[in-house]
């Protein structure tokens, strides 16, 4: 009898481990939203707390390829590609408005289509103003915010933004063409490698980003979004008001050497959410490329103390 019980316990343990492994496997799916087929990655058990991961420029959900497996044991993770990014379709500009507000509406409808009713958000770069819009529209759905170089403060804008602000005031065709350098290969490589420990960033991420941005029609779409980024800066006061009003649990983890969104942007969260956690890692803009393990631990520690009463 003891031997039978031992064998039964062993089998149950094996089944449990198999189920856990299956839940932790990365899955790749698509969902139709308006006239756009949205690609997304998913990992973890849907019965566990959900984290929606929103990528930046010029990347895709591929940027979360290392982070998601590290979190999948404790959380359900979903990471969509925005329209005209990564594997998601690029509807024609004549029939689809490429603005941050519209991208946020698409992501909003996507979350409803895949059944997300409450979720934490990991927001980065372009994904930040998209995610902050979702939070303003549906504050009751947001259980926590993890901002990784995801700015909402004027003081968080690095020097490079001065030229863009001048362009926003006077958006001529000539200036529009100048900003095509933002998605040149050498610029994308610089975004990944500047400020990171030497030899810590492989070529996979920036090579794939460059491939995606070179797809037909995407260059002009990126030009549209570079101009429309001014709408995000205009909404900074509203984003900040949301924080002051709802006081969501907030973790800011910043690559401290990022020239685009500088450390002052992380520190400023304390002004609106006094209990916000602020951490810096010795990396650049794409901090996950070199510090995904450290960032995963910060996220686990943070959510362990915030989600137990929020979901």
List each language-model region with its residue ranges.
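Bacterial Sec-dependent N-terminal signal peptides
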Residues: 1-22, 311
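Flexible "cap/lid" subdomain of the alpha/beta-hydrolase fold that forms the substrate-access gate
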Residues: 23-38, 43-46, 50, 78, ...
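Structural cue for short, hydrophobic secondary-structure segments
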Residues: 53-56, 79
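Active-site glycine-rich loops that stabilize anionic/oxyanionic intermediates
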Residues: 56-59, 125
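Serine-hydrolase catalytic-loop signature spanning alpha/beta hydrolases and amidase-signature enzymes
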Residues: 58-66, 77
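Active-site machinery of serine-nucleophile hydrolases
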Residues: 72-81
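Catalytic histidine-centered segment of alpha/beta-hydrolase-like enzymes
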Residues: 284-296
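C-terminal alpha-helix
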Residues: 298-306
């Amino acid at each position: 009898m003891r031997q039978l019980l031992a064998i039964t316990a062993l089998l149950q343990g094996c089944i449990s481990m198999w189920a856990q492994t299956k839940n932790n496997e990365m899955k790749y799916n698509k969902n139709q939203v308006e006239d756009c087929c949205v690609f997304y990655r998913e990992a973890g058990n849907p019965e566990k707390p959900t984290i929606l991961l929103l990528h930046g420029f010029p990347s895709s959900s591929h940027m979360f390829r290392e982070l998601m497996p590290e979190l999948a044991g404790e959380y359900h993770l979903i990471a969509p590609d925005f329209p005209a990014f990564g594997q998601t379709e690029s509807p024609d500009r004549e029939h689809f408005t490429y603005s941050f507000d519209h991208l946020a509406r698409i992501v909003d409808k996507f979350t409803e289509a895949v059944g997300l009713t409450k979720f934490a958000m990991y927001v980065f770069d372009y994904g930040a103003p998209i995610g902050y819009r979702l939070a303003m529209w549906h504050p009751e759905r947001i259980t926590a915010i993890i901002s990784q170089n995801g700015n909402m403060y004027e003081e968080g804008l690095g020097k490079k933004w001065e030229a863009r602000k001048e362009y926003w005031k006077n958006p001529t065709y000539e200036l529009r063409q100048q900003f095509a350098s933002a998605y040149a290969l050498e610029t994308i490589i610089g975004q990944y490698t500047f400020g990171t420990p030497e030899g810590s960033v492989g070529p996979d991420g920036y090579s794939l980003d460059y491939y995606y941005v070179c797809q037909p029609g995407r260059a002009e779409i990126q030009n549209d979004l570079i101009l429309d980024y001014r709408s995000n800066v205009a909404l900074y006061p509203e984003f900040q008001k949301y924080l002051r009003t709802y006081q969501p649990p907030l973790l800011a983890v910043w690559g401290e050497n990022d020239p685009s969104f500088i450390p002052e942007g992380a520190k400023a969260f304390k002004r609106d959410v006094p209990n916000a956690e602020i951490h810096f890692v010795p990396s650049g803009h794409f901090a996950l490329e070199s510090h995904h393990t450290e960032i995963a631990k910060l996220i686990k520690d943070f959510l362990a103390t915030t989600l137990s009463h929020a979901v």
